[in-house]
């Protein structure tokens, strides 16, 4: 057992396999674990244990996902693999498994198929920043020209969705060959691991990003002023910092004159901590739940955006009937509901429970948002959908 396994000092990167059904995503996941365990040490995982993915509930949505881990000399990877297409759709939209990069698996025997395209589109919509291609089953194709053709098709398809199709790494391999211990194919898995190490940049840690805290509660403390509480999502809040209050109303700025946690006064609060922030000269009725406290200029409020939405099925506790244009549910962002109008893509009349759909949403009040922000769709407090902001309009 190599000592490396227990050192958590290496950078941690989240990846996952995406691509068409039966193109070998799970076989590749097993091949990566097995080959890298052999080469660098770590724990091998077989196909059956990965394929038998447990169901998880993320915001009431049932998703089957397998989580595996593996190491390269310079990094520790957490990798997600889903058994079914619907699981991928839900996973990507809810952000249940955030990916710093995706491994797109395309069988050389088939080339790009409908779900290949759909996963690339979803990756673009939900903001997967980097994609590496693993062309699988290359041991089944004798014709070198055919391999080149498939590679070209995949690159063109990625470019169509604004990924750098000409420049991203494409590895031609055989997951099954590697799993069976054939050296030429194991070498391709190592090549894939090297591509992960070099092509996907180390993700910026939450604590290094600009400060943001969704406001959950507001108190006024006699003689001290107004305190807002919440969990810091990213960055650091230091006493004396200027902060903006963004969303719902016009943006205002003020100074944080105190940070407290568990009734103790601190100099700062960091990402992941639940804190109270004392705001200078702010009145109790000028701030409300649903707004965010943020580094000035780092985030802006918006009302209109394009989103990718998964509509819960009846079995997941969602609607029993479809909805049509003119539907006006609540959109739950971070800590609060805001009513919004939707418009459906051209030619789409209705949306059935269990569908995923692109829709443009116009909220009745602005919310602090960036592309990639997740939200829930609710009717009277019951979740009926999950979505992600794909593109901001105004």
UniProtKB/Swiss-Prot annotation:
Binding-site residues for Mg(2+), renumbered to this chain: 26
Subcellular location: Cytoplasm
InterPro entries for the chain: EF-Tu_GTP-bd, EF-Tu_GTPase, EFTu-like_2, EFTU_2, G_TR_CS, P-loop_NTPase, Small_GTP-bd, T_Tr_GTP-bd_dom
EC number: 3.6.5.3
Record region (G2): 60-64
Function (record text): GTP hydrolase that promotes the GTP-dependent binding of aminoacyl-tRNA to the A-site of ribosomes during protein biosynthesis.
Family in the record: Belongs to the TRAFAC class translation factor GTPase superfamily. Classic translation factor GTPase family. EF-Tu/EF-1A subfamily.
Protein name as catalogued: Elongation factor Tu
Source organism of this protein record: Vibrio parahaemolyticus serotype O3:K6 (strain RIMD 2210633)
Phylogenetic classification of the source organism: Bacteria, Pseudomonadati, Pseudomonadota, Gammaproteobacteria, Vibrionales
């Amino acid at each position: 057992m190599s000592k490396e396994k227990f050192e958590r000092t290496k950078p941690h990167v989240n990846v996952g396999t995406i691509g068409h059904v039966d193109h070998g995503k799970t076989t590749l996941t097993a091949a990566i674990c097995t080959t890298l365990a052999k080469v660098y040490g770590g724990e091998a995982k077989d196909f059956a244990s990965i394929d038998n993915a447990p169901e998880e509930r993320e915001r009431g949505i049932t998703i089957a996902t397998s989580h595996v881990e593996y190491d390269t000399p310079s990094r520790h990877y957490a990798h997600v693999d889903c058994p079914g297409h619907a699981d991928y759709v839900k996973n990507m939209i809810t952000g249940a498994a955030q990916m710093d990069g995706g491994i797109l698996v395309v069988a050389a025997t088939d080339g790009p198929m409908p779900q290949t395209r759909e996963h690339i589109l979803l990756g673009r919509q939900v903001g997967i920043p980097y994609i590496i291609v693993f062309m699988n089953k290359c041991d089944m194709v004798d014709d070198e020209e055919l391999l080149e053709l498939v590679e070209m098709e995949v690159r063109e398809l990625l470019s169509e969705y604004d990924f750098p199709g000409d420049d991203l790494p494409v590895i031609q391999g055989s997951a099954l060959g590697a799993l069976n211990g054939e050296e030429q194919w194991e070498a391709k898995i190592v090549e894939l691991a090297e591509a992960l190490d070099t092509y996907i940049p180390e993700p910026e840690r939450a604590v290094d990003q600009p400060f943001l805290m969704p406001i959950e509660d507001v108190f006024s403390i006699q003689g001290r002023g107004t305190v807002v509480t919440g969990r810091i999502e990213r960055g650091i809040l230091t006493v004396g910092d200027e902060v903006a209050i963004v969303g719902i109303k016009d943006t205002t700025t003020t100074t944080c004159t105190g940070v407290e946690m568990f009734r103790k006064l601190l100099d700062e609060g960091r990402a992941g901590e639940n804190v109270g922030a004392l705001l200078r000269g702010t009145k109790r009725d000028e701030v409300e739940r649903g707004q965010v406290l943020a580094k000035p200029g780092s985030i802006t409020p918006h009302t209109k955006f394009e989103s990718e939405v998964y509509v819960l099925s009846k079995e997941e506790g969602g609607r029993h009937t479809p909805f049509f244009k003119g539907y006006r549910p609540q959109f739950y962002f971070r800590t609060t509901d805001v009513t919004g109008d939707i418009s459906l893509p051209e030619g789409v009349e209705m949306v059935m429970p269990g569908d995923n759909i692109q829709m443009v949403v116009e909220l009745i009040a602005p919310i602090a948002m960036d592309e990639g922000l997740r939200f829930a769709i609710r009717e009277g407090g019951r979740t009926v959908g999950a979505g992600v902001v794909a593109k901001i309009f105004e």
